[in-house]
Amino acid sequence: MEKNQSFKAPRNVNDLTSSLSAVIFKQKVLVLIDAANLFFSTSVTKIHIDFKQMYNWFSKKCNLVDVMYYTAFDPDDVKQMAFLQDLEKSGYKLIQKPIKVYSSMIKGNMDIELAVDAMNLEKQYDILALFSGDGDFTYLIQDLEKKGKRIIVIATGGFTSYELHQQAHNYFFLNRISSIWRTPRKTSQSDGVDSQNLLPKILPPDVVLDKQTKVTPKTKLPRKNPVREVPQVFID
């Protein structure tokens, strides 16, 4: 499948949402979410996702094959476990494994699981919507495109690999399609699966921890190019 060379990101949120809707309309779409990558980028940029709203949007706009959420978890984190249970109730398929704790780090990379599923399920979908800015998935995208699949990357601006951005057929900034995942609320009470109350408190499983390193929403990151590699806190 040839890339859509004429695609240009619209200037406003409504146009960008409409463009994504037009791309996936009535198509067989598989949505894969790299939770660790999504968590880190959205926590730093203070984007809070209503996952229930996002699932409902995709289910209405396309022939949704599945929405698969890849994450490592801490079985002792009550709030994280409740969050994951709510995701499952909302229709998400969880692919998860417990984190591994070492003397100076916590590890829980799910890249291999995501890539294997994307390949094993290739006959079931026409479009793959990947929620991740991780450049490690560039090779996966190249392989799927050779097999005729259309790849959409949805990630946070400034936290996306340049190679991943360039390889995908279409790229959408998460903060430019907010009507998909954010429902206006009259109160601060969450109705459904809202990352504002739960996700920012969950430790990203792929972040290396030591006594000198602490990643918070106030972390200042170096700015080089408008689209740059994700800071190297995610480990293989």
Identify the function of each model-found stretch.
Residues 2-110, 150:
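Domain-level signal for Mg2+-assisted phosphodiester chemistry and nucleotide/NA-binding surfaces
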Residues 50, 175-178, 227:
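General structural signal for secondary-structure boundaries
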Residues 2-19, 195-236:
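Low-complexity, prion-like intrinsically disordered regions of RNA granule-associated mRNA regulation factors
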Residues 75-210, 214, 233-235:
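Nuclease catalytic cores that cleave nucleic-acid phosphodiester bonds
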